[in-house]
Each structure stands twice: as structure tokens, then as C-alpha cells.
């Protein structure tokens, strides 16, 4: 039913602070073909840190 190469795949964003905390989101593969990095809140260290896309 679902396409193998979906335009908006579900990705995990993992904290670069080393806490293991993750966010789950979707990204548009046409607009962002590379791995994305977002600055989001990590509740373990109670700070905003970079979250990188995990494959």
C-alpha cells in the first residue's frame, strides 16, 4: 500500500548532548535531501541543543 520511497518519511531526531533523547517527525525529501539538524529542547539536560537526523 505505502510507497517504498515516500516523499515525507518519518525520521528520528537524536540529541547531540549524548542523553539518548529523541524526537520523531516527518521531513520533505524533495526540499531537504540531506540530513537535517534542528535546535530543540532536551528535557534531560534542560537546555536547547542540536538534534540530528538518525537513519
Curated annotation (Swiss-Prot):
Classification via SUPFAM superfamilies: Zn-binding ribosomal proteins
Pfam families: Ribosomal_L33
Residue runs in coiled coils: none
Keyword tags: Ribonucleoprotein, Ribosomal protein
GO cellular component: cytosolic large ribosomal subunit
GO biological process: translation
GO molecular function: structural constituent of ribosome
InterPro entries given in the database record: Ribosomal_bL33 (IPR001705), Ribosomal_bL33_CS (IPR018264), Ribosomal_bL33_sf (IPR038584), Ribosomal_zn-bd (IPR011332)
PROSITE patterns in the cross-refs: RIBOSOMAL_L33 (PS00582)
Family the entry assigns: Belongs to the bacterial ribosomal protein bL33 family.
HAMAP family (UniProt xref): Ribosomal_bL33
Protein name as catalogued: Large ribosomal subunit protein bL33
Source species of the chain: Micrococcus luteus (strain ATCC 4698 / DSM 20030 / JCM 1464 / CCM 169 / CCUG 5858 / IAM 1056 / NBRC 3333 / NCIMB 9278 / NCTC 2665 / VKM Ac-2230) (Micrococcus lysodeikticus)
Top-level taxonomy: Bacteria, Bacillati, Actinomycetota, Actinomycetes, Micrococcales
Amino acid at each position: 500500500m505505502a510507497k517504498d520511497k515516500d516523499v515525507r518519511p518519518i525520521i528520528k531526531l537524536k540529541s547531540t548532548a549524548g542523553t539518548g533523547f529523541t524526537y520523531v517527525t516527518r521531513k520533505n525529501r524533495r526540499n531537504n535531501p540531506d540530513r537535517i539538524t534542528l535546535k530543540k529542547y532536551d528535557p534531560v539536560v534542560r537546555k536547547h541543543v542540536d538534534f540530528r537526523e538518525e537513519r
